[in-house]
């Protein structure tokens, strides 16, 4: 079973476009687990208005993006997810994102993370760049030795990655005090399992003034 997990917080402005892009994936067999992190705007009523049976809505108090995603990982594991894909509330997924990434995560013998390239858009949805990997000068290792590279340059964005069940089980107890979940999980995969890069753009990642961090929005 595939689980897409999303943490929301005061995201009503961009959320409909992202939800629609996820729910219109060409690979349709998945659940979308959404945890609202104590929003004070219209995010929760908006989410309640979606009737797609694949959506699982959790409403909680504000604990911050990292802890919120930790709770989502636990829920995905509890529901038996074999693959988990992280989803920001303000991006736009290309229609075949899951279809392109799912085959790469069928491996079950080792903890594995797959991440892809992406393009960028601004707050108005205007395309601001093509390949992020190329424009940022990311040095993606060709030999599969990701651990030292990730220590020097944490370039795995959660919004563009997925993990298998083995890595999910290693990610259920994220340490307190880490800034974001994606770097920690990527380092865990690189040290104890496998990391694979898909050199294709699978999402439009939105950079705007309200992103959760300068690297990646919540």
Predicted regions and their residues:
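Nucleotide-sugar donor-binding/catalytic module of glycosyltransferases
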Residues: 1-217
